[in-house]
Amino acid sequence: TTLINMIGGIYYPDSGSIYYENKRVEIRSPKDADRLGIGVVHQHFKLVSSMDAVENIEIALSDKEYKNKADIRKRITDVAKKYGFTVNPDKKICDMSVSEKQTVEIIKAIIKGAKILILDEPTAVLTPQESSSLFNVIRLMKKDGKSIIIITHKLQEVLDISDNVYIMRKGRYIDTLKTSETDENELACKMVGKTVTLQIARTSYEKKKTVLSVHNISCLSDDKTVGLSDVSFDLKSGEIL
């Protein structure tokens, strides 16, 4: 996160250099990063909750390419259609799900002209289905010629989506590996600096006493979408569920 904040212009490095297209560059602000075509989607979104998607993107644009909200709304719709996003341009950020907010951030970066897109822990707060949809979008961006950096600790996601893996530990560079030539065990060992086992002995709780049962729970969210649908589970004594 610290590293991408330097690439994105939020922090300035004490030493070292950044090169963009083989030229040394000074990135002293997010505007500098924007001008270079570097877009960052932070783990904590940089959106104004009381505004809708159109308004958030409008205030992020530094030029006059889009003269009014209708132009921006059309551009949002075009980008969403191209990459398979689902987004309501007129929905307020405060009424959006986490996935929808992330979509707005990505679309904002694309509209601002990002050639390099950096995503900080993009699946940390997404469901597996939302993560799968995001990865489909990322693959389309790759085909479109965009370069993408994903910061994540989820090893299976690293293997599923990346071409190469850059490993850091305690703020230091450790190694760069081709994804096709590594596996979860090697990545885990390099990340923590020692041999680890990913196999865990599981205890059977089939015969344990049931201490909590939930049956067929359903409810609607505040926006009247499905919050829970027919959820059931049992919790056994001594079990971590």
Specify the residue positions occupied by each region the protein language model found:
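Glycine-rich phosphate-binding loops of nucleotide-dependent enzymes
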Residues: 1-241
